[in-house]
Amino acid sequence: MDEIIKSTDNRYSEYETLLFLRDKLRKEAYAWKNRYLAEFGNLITAVFEQKIACIKKKKTISFCQMAVNRGKPVDQAELQNYLSQEMKEYNRKLSEMIQENEIAHSGEIISEETAAKIKKLYYRLAKQIHPDMNPKTNERPELKELWQRIVVSYRANDLEELEEAEILVNKFLVDHHLDGNEIKIQDIDTKIEKLKEHIQKIKETNPYQYRFLLQDQEAVQNKKRELQKELEEYRVYEQELDQLLEQMMKNGVSFLWRMN
């Protein structure tokens, strides 16, 4: 049977400390990601957009060549359907990148006082309903939804939203007689080790590692030059593909247009 540790145990204090450290690092990683996108997002998006333009033209050339090999005209409707399917995932990813980039560029800087209030309030709420500390949260859909709201607000530095969430959390706990209950954690030693591993992984990977790049202005400028170079290479490549398509047209590739 798994050992059950009550919230008064010293190992619980260690577990709680590690849990808050992991969440703090997650938030910092999220902030570094936004700073990275604020710095490089426009160029990264432009590079990817140019890349998928080249992919689309390569697929167009391939489709046309297959029609030529069969001795048939290129069916324009079939070509558009083919490209629509083939490019769907690329376009979805591009839309996602554009959205993330917009969010990163719209970020507001908060005061140290507000940051301290957010941290204190988050820790207070986490002690009440963090799913890794209070099993009741995953058992109650309302609490689970409130916790997700808290996580989003914490990462977004939204103090007002956190304050509203605290009111709702306290009301729910009182209404359902869940306030003041002693929290019990099963198999806490294993969970402590997993938390330590997770913390180390966050520290050693992106987006947390972006901080080393962003704190080095020379590295930032080098990164921008690399992205600009990549963008220019894709632009040149697109021109080459345009010339290839134009040559195919000159060599007699014909298109079949269907009238509605």
Could you tell me what each predicted segment is?
Residues 1-110, 153-260:
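Short "pre-J" leader segments immediately N-terminal to J/J-like domains in DnaJ-family
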Residues 102-106, 120-139:
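The canonical J-domain HPD catalytic loop and its flanking helix-turn segment that engages Hsp70
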Residues 110-117:
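Short pre-active-site segment immediately N-terminal to the catalytic Zn-binding motif
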Residues 134-159:
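Chromatin/DNA-recognition segments of nuclear transcriptional regulators
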Residues 41, 119-120:
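Short alpha-helical basic/polar micro-motif
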